[in-house]
């Protein structure tokens, strides 16, 4: 086993046993843990309060109790998250930060508040017009409300110094993860889709400084190896989440490497650093204003062009759109993105996904056919 494989196996173990690692961290540090749901929750506030931010993106749990509170056409990320909460899977959490980026998330917050009484609901309400000064001031006012809740839960005061330190820790992590994504495009034979996912997904369950250092060490091991020509196909992936190992293994079976992504669960979290400003709160407001993401207000619909440019830069042969079933923002984006891809002459395929998928044969057929056309 190579040294890099040892790192990948460590990340894999964390991904497959997240609760074990979360509980271990809590026991070792004495910190309380706060759940952070999609998308762009201000985890820096949690860290500045001396607590442990934990990513919560659903699972492949079978639905039962959540069906009482959600209609069938709510995405499986939210349905399975509520199911897990109702089943006590998140009882180690002291709070859950829930955003309002889509209609389904708005429902999620209210349902969580109603049904999960032992975990405090922390609403993260963000402005649609995030770039104007009024939007920035509104966001800061909401973050201040979040700070009050987090201080009450933790018993710690969030100071400018602690928030500044948290921002620096997160920005350093963002830089390293961006570097890792770029490295994956240069070593597609080593950083396979499943191994790439282990690194990306494990970040949600680890201390950020620890994850940053571990990814750095992994990259050093890989950089010591001479890059070899890759005989397979290179693709860019886009969507909300694509963390199913069964699905990613289908890419590997067809000799397809992921050389870049516009996945909300992956690189979209990291591509916007925090600019300098007068105060730490100003910095967070400016960062949010600078985010270019179609799940936020994006009247110019630049997502397709962004992916086209990435595909050209990383010499991708095609694009795979992993469409989360019942995700309205994604479904609205697709027609314009399809047009952008076709005008650029870049082949693409749409694969519908669901957290509860058991049979991937339809996806297998589509991916195999797509690979053969590249």
UniProtKB/Swiss-Prot annotation:
Enzyme class of the recorded protein, top EC level: lyase
Function, in words: Component of the phenyllactate dehydratase complex FldABC that is involved in the fermentation of L-phenylalanine via a Stickland reaction. This complex catalyzes the reversible syn-dehydration of (R)-phenyllactate to (E)-cinnamate in two steps, a CoA-transfer from cinnamoyl-CoA to phenyllactate, catalyzed by FldA, followed by the dehydration of phenyllactyl-CoA to cinnamoyl-CoA, catalyzed by FldB and FldC. Requires the activator FldI to initiate catalysis.
GO molecular function, one term: metal ion binding
Cofactor note: Appears to contain about 1 [4Fe-4S] cluster per heterodimer FldBC.
Listed EC numbers: 4.2.1.175
InterPro entries named in the record: FldB/FldC_alpha/beta
Reactions catalysed according to its record: (R)-3-phenyllactoyl-CoA = (E)-cinnamoyl-CoA + H2O; (R)-3-(4-hydroxyphenyl)lactoyl-CoA = (E)-4-coumaroyl-CoA + H2O; (R)-3-(indol-3-yl)lactoyl-CoA = (E)-3-(indol-3-yl)acryloyl-CoA + H2O
Alphabetical GO biological process terms: L-phenylalanine catabolic process; L-phenylalanine metabolic process
Organism annotation: Clostridium sporogenes
Keyword Iron-sulfur attached: yes
Entry's family note: Belongs to the FldB/FldC dehydratase alpha/beta subunit family.
The protein's name in its UniProt record: (R)-phenyllactyl-CoA dehydratase beta subunit
Protein's pathway: Amino-acid degradation; L-phenylalanine degradation
Top-rank lineage group of the source organism: Bacteria
Keywords, ordered alphabetically: 4Fe-4S, Iron, Iron-sulfur, Lyase, Metal-binding
Transmembrane domains' residue ranges: none
Complex and partners: Part of the heterotrimeric phenyllactate dehydratase complex FldABC, composed of (R)-phenyllactate CoA-transferase (FldA) and a heterodimeric (R)-phenyllactyl-CoA dehydratase (FldB and FldC).
Cofactor(s) needed for function: [4Fe-4S] cluster
């Amino acid at each position: 086993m190579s040294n890099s494989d040892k790192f990948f196996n460590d990340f894999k173990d964390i991904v497959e046993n997240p609760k074990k690692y979360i509980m271990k961290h809590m026991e070792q540090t004495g910190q309380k843990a706060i759940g952070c749901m999609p998308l762009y929750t201000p985890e820096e506030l949690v860290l500045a309060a001396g607590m442990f931010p934990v990513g919560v993106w659903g699972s492949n749990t079978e639905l039962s109790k959540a069906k009482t509170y959600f209609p069938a056409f709510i995405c499986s990320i939210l349905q399975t998250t509520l199911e897990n909460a109702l089943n006590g899977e998140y009882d180690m959490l002291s709070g859950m930060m829930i955003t309002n980026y889509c209609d389904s998330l708005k429902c999620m917050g209210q349902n969580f508040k109603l049904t999960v009484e032992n975990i405090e609901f922390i609403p993260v309400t963000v402005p649609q017009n995030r770039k104007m000064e009024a939007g920035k001031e509104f966001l800061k006012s909401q973050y201040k409300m979040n700070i009050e809740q987090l201080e009450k839960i933790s018993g710690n005061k969030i100071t400018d110094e602690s928030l500044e330190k948290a921002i620096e820790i997160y920005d350093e992590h963002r830089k390293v993860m961006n570097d890792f994504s770029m490295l994956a495009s240069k070593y597609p034979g080593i950083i396979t889709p499943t191994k790439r996912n282990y690194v990306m997904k494990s970040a949600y369950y680890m201390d950020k400084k620890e994850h940053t250092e571990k990814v750095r060490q992994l990259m050093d091991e890989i950089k010591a190896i001479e890059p070899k020509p890759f005989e397979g196909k290179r693709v860019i992936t886009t969507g909300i989440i694509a963390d199913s190992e069964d699905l990613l293994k289908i890419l590997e079976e067809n000799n397809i490497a992921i050389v870049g992504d516009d996945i909300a669960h992956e690189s979209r979290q990291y591509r916007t650093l925090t600019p300098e400003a007068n105060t730490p709160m100003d910095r967070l407001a400016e960062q949010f204003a600078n985010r270019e993401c179609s799940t936020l207000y994006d009247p110019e619909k630049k997502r397709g062009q962004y992916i086209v440019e990435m595909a050209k830069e990383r010499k991708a042969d095609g694009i795979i759109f992993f469409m989360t079933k019942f995700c309205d923002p994604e479904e609205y984006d697709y027609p314009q993105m399809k047009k952008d891809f076709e005008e650029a002459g870049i082949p693409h395929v749409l694969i519908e996904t669901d957290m509860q998928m058991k049979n991937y044969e339809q996806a297998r057929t589509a991916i195999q056919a797509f690979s053969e056309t590249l």
